[in-house]
């Protein structure tokens, strides 16, 4: 699709957001919200220690995802070459992932009761939010950054979005 488009248009930049789905990010978020809604504040069930969540962040999986991202970026470069572009004739921009939630202390609503979910729209335990911001997101973004380096694509840029929603 990119190659076909680039053949008939003057493409100067390709922006890529990649990797989150390979860490099953949506399933992780779903687990965190489910654990928040299904456990009381006096006995919270955290998602960060669920086996299904932890499996996404093993060193083996991190390395595999990093390699997949690198290969996808190389495919982008090859598509541009096939469309007739010199490597210096376009720029690859790879986005890191923004944090969709604050750290635990940054929530507007208490984690006791359901107002954090029903009013605030973000049912996460503080510990899970801290884990997401302090471990999961840096791991995902580290894999993205590493894959850009591993790809060796000259002139590739990284657009750092991790803190884009802060404040």
Task: Annotate the PLM regions.
Residues 3-167:
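Alpha-helical cap/lid subdomain in secreted, periplasmic
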């Amino acid at each position: 699709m990119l190659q076909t488009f680039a053949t008939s248009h003057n493409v100067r930049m390709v922006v890529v957001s990649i990797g989150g789905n390979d860490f099953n990010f949506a399933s992780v978020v779903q687990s965190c919200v489910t654990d928040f809604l299904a456990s009381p504040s006096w006995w919270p069930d955290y998602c960060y220690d669920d086996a299904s969540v932890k499996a996404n962040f093993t060193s083996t999986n991190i390395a595999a995802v990093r390699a997949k991202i690198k290969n996808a970026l190389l495919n982008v470069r090859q598509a541009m070459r096939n469309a007739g572009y010199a490597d210096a004739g376009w720029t690859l921009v790879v986005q890191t992932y923004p944090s969709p939630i604050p750290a635990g202390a940054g929530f507007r609503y208490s984690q006791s009761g359901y107002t954090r979910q029903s009013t605030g729209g973000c049912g996460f335990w503080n510990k899970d939010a801290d884990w997401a911001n302090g471990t999961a997101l840096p791991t995902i973004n580290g894999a993205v950054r590493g894959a850009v380096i591993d790809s060796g694509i000259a002139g590739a840029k990284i657009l750092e979005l991790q803190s884009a929603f802060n404040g």
